[in-house]
């Protein structure tokens, strides 16, 4: 960011272009519009650095900008605003964005870096701003592939277009060892999913997240669990206590679900299918993807101006787990032990910005859990070899 004084007078160091750190102790509602605008070009409205209150103030300020008419396009002006009696013009000339504003009785010009310009552009309100032919657009990272490699080896590709549902570094990081992190993985995901970002289905019936949280708690899965521990199956009374605490005991409407979950929660293969679905499920802590976040916001900016702000939030992810009972090929017993096998599909679906608008990155892992599979890292490792796990990555973009 370069600042010059149009009147060739010495720039006032107390101007709004003085550095405003993200950790400023000044109350947000006491910041001047200049301080807020500086934060916008530094981080962008949708940065994970910003709180909801900060985003609200920033959005309110950016809503003041209107598209410039063709006859007003001095120096490539494409947007203007009058805030607190101060006139501000945004100009794009030869691919360089500048902000013109009044500082006392002087007109100042601030030239933005490419990152600052893109942060500013992505924060403008959903109006048609004419940026001219000089504006270049870079397509987002995209690709489709299937691989038998374990999940850690595809994280580098996945991270290019996804952020995480894990809100901070308080949760466990992805490990490189096969299934040794599985208990920590499900614990951190369920703990982080208080906003219902995780959905779990059995035969297309959604299992309430609170029920799953109570289940893993009863199974002894917590932040202190030994990664090599084999889970002990719950008794009927333990399962019944969990079920009754989540469903009204006298309500006959839930009888089918109560019977179903009572049966599933006592099946070691189902517990194995459920817990393994969270294993190294391509979730990454938000702090580790901030640079990728900035890159996405920088590279994909054209049509985002046409969408409402809530559609432009990039850190909006979902973890979808589907578990289906395997239908036997004949009428004989499903297995010698009377158990059943399960097909598992685990997908993370983070929304993102593309040149075509709002899209979805689908990162999916699918595999089979055989009847009788024991819920332990060793049991999962023996029953679900790497070659049985198919990881696919794709971008799904809407038609525009």
From Swiss-Prot:
Complex and partners: Monomer. Interacts specifically with alpha tubulin, a major component of microtubule.
Enzyme Commission code(s) on record: 3.4.22.-
Family: Belongs to the protease EspG/VirA family.
Pfam families from the UniProt entry: EspG
Regulation: Inhibited by the cysteine protease inhibitors leupeptin and cystatin-C.
Role played: Alpha-tubulin-specific protease that is required for entry into epithelial cells and for subsequent intra- and intercellular spreading. Contributes to bacterial entry into epithelial cells by inducing microtubule (MT) destabilization and the formation of membrane ruffles. The membrane ruffling evoked by VirA results from the activation of host rac1, which is associated with the destruction of MT networks. Creates a tunnel inside the host cell cytoplasm by breaking down the microtubule infrastructure.
Taxonomic source organism: Shigella flexneri
Subcellular location: Secreted
Protein name as it appears in the record: Cysteine protease-like VirA
UniProt xrefs under Gene3D superfamilies: EspG protein, N-terminal domain
Spans annotated as Tubulin-binding domain: 224-315
GO terms under cellular component: extracellular region
């Amino acid at each position: 960011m370069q600042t010059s004084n149009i009147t060739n007078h010495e720039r006032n160091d107390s101007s709004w272009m003085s550095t405003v750190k993200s950790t400023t102790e000044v109350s947000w509602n006491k910041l001047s519009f200049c301080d807020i605008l500086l934060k916008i070009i530094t981080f962008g409205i949708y940065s994970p650095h910003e709180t909801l209150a900060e985003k609200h103030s920033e959005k309110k300020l950016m809503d003041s900008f209107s598209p410039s008419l063709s006859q007003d396009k001095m120096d490539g002006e494409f947007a203007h605003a009058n805030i607190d009696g101060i006139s501000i013009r945004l100009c794009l000339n030869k691919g360089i964005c500048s902000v013109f504003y009044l500082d006392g009785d002087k007109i100042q010009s601030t030239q933005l870096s490419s990152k600052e310009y893109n942060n500013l552009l992505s924060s403008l309100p959903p109006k048609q701003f004419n940026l001219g032919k000089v504006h270049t657009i870079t397509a987002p990272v995209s690709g489709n592939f299937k691989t038998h490699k374990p999940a850690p080896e595809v994280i580098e590709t996945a991270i290019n277009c996804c952020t995480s549902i894990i809100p901070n570094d308080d949760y466990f990081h992805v490990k490189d060892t096969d299934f040794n992190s599985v208990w920590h993985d499900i614990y951190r995901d369920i703990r982080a999913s208080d906003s219902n970002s995780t959905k779990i289905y059995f035969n297309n019936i959604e299992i309430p997240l609170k029920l799953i949280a109570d289940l893993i708690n009863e199974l002894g899965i917590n932040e202190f669990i030994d990664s090599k521990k084999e889970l002990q199956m719950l008794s009927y009374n333990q399962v019944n206590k969990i079920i009754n605490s989540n469903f009204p005991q006298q309500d006959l409407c839930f009888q089918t679900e109560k019977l179903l979950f009572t049966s599933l929660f006592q099946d070691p293969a189902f517990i194995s299918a459920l817990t393994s679905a969270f294993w190294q499920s391509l979730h990454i802590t938000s702090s580790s993807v901030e640079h990728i976040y900035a890159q996405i916001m920088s590279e994909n900016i054209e049509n985002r101006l046409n969408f409402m702000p809530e559609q432009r939030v990039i850190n909006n992810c979902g973890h979808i787990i589907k578990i289906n009972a395997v239908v036997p090929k004949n009428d004989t017993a499903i297995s010698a032990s009377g158990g059943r096998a399960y097909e598992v599909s685990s997908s993370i679906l983070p929304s993102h910005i593309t040149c075509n608008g709002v899209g979805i990155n689908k990162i999916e892992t699918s595999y089979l859990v055989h009847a009788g599979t024991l819920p332990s890292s060793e049991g999962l490792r023996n029953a679900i070899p790497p070659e049985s796990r198919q990881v696919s990555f794709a971008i799904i973009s809407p038609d525009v």
